[in-house]
Amino acid sequence: PIHQRYLLSLQDMDRSKHLAEMIEAGVTTFKIEGRLKDRDYVTNIVAYYRQQLDQLIDSNPMLQHASTPSVYRYDFIPNPAKTFHRGATDYFLHGRTPNMANWDTPKSTGEKIGKVVAIKHNAICVELAPGITLHNGDGICYQDKGFAINRIEGDWIFPNIQVSRIGNRVIGT
């Protein structure tokens, strides 16, 4: 029912795939929306766009930095799905876009990290997707509620809440 949906849970504006065409159209300044976002989100998104813009500048001799480029150093791989993320849309860049909101949850959905394959007492076993590593303190969206990880032992995750269903998709945030 519509009264149980999140009608104002908009997806994140992501125009990173359109940077080249925006530069070609004459755009010289990009604003990163970070209102009400935490430091990790802003750091990740700015680093991601910096990386995308640097690749465009390096591959096109007609482009140059507007000022002396600084050396940007970060000890992570920028990825918008790794911090608060409800899906991405370019909104109205090329006309009306379907599915600009995530009506099912106001929470960050992150990326799919695996599937619950077993539950034992106060822990769950997740079959992780290739390349996924979890750490104590990571956030996970499980079913609709999600939980924080108290402890990791191999494939076993000890959440801070009781879980009860096997087979659910697990999404890391």
Residue ranges and their predicted role:
Residues 1-173:
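Surface-exposed amphipathic alpha-helical tracts and adjacent flexible/coil segments at the periphery
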